[in-house]
Design a protein with these regions (language model features):
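Residue-level hotspots at or immediately adjacent to binding/recognition sites across diverse folds
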Residues: 1-176
Length: 176
C-alpha cells in the first residue's frame, strides 16, 4: 500500500500488479486474517480510510467513524485493532464494523503489533501502550525520548523503531 490509493499485489514477490483501490487517499497500514485484508489510510476526504478485500483485488470502502488519519492495523485475540493519528483506537471482529475505544494518547499512535497474547502500540511521543483485549489499554513509559514509528513482534520479541535510530526490544511488551 502507498500514496494516492496505491495497492500492489504479487503471487511471487517479484512481479507486482496495481489494483484499483477506489480511493486517492494515502494508505499506511495493511493486515490479513480470516480471509480478509484490511487497509487503513489518510483522511483528506474528512474521514479516516478503511478498505477491505477478500482477494486483494476488489476493495470495499468501510466507515471509520473518525476524522483522523488511520496509521496502522493489526489482528490478534480474534479482532482487528487500528490506531489513528490522534491516539484513537478502534476494534472490529470482521474488519467491516468498527467500534471506537478510549483514546490513549492525544499525540498519535503510529504503529503496533500483536504477540505474546497482547497488542503493543507506539506513539509519536515515545510512549508504548499495551492491551490484552484491544479495548482496555495500559501506558508503559518507554525509555525513548524520540518518536516511535512502528512495532513488530517476531521470535518472541517486540521491537520498536523510531527517529534518530531508536530501537528498543522487549519480550513482554512491558519492560523495554
Amino acid at each position: 500500500v502507498g500514496n494516492s490509493g496505491t495497492i500492489l499485489t504479487s503471487s511471487d514477490g517479484t512481479t507486482w500488479t496495481s489494483r484499483t483501490s477506489g480511493t486517492t487517499e494515502h494508505l499506511y497500514g495493511i493486515t490479513y486474517e480470516n480471509s480478509t485484508f484490511v487497509v487503513v489510510g489518510d483522511n483528506s476526504s474528512g474521514s479516516g480510510t478503511i478498505l477491505t478485500s477478500s482477494d486483494g483485488i476488489t476493495w470495499i470502502t468501510r466507515t471509520s467513524g473518525t476524522t483522523n488519519s488511520l496509521w496502522d492495523v493489526n489482528y490478534g485475540n480474534n479482532k482487528f485493532v487500528l490506531s489513528d493519528g490522534a491516539g484513537g483506537i478502534q476494534s472490529s471482529s470482521d474488519g467491516i464494523s468498527w467500534t471506537s475505544r478510549v483514546g490513549i494518547d492525544t499525540y498519535g499512535i503510529w504503529g503496533g503489533a500483536y504477540g505474546n497474547s497482547k497488542f503493543v502500540v507506539a506513539s509519536v511521543w515515545g510512549y508504548i501502550f499495551t492491551s490484552s483485549d484491544g479495548t482496555s489499554w495500559n501506558n508503559v513509559i518507554s525509555r525513548s525520548a524520540n518518536a516511535l514509528n512502528d512495532v513488530v513482534y517476531e521470535n518472541s520479541t517486540f521491537v520498536t523503531v523510531g527517529v534518530n535510530g531508536t530501537i528498543q526490544t522487549s519480550s513482554d511488551g512491558t519492560s523495554w
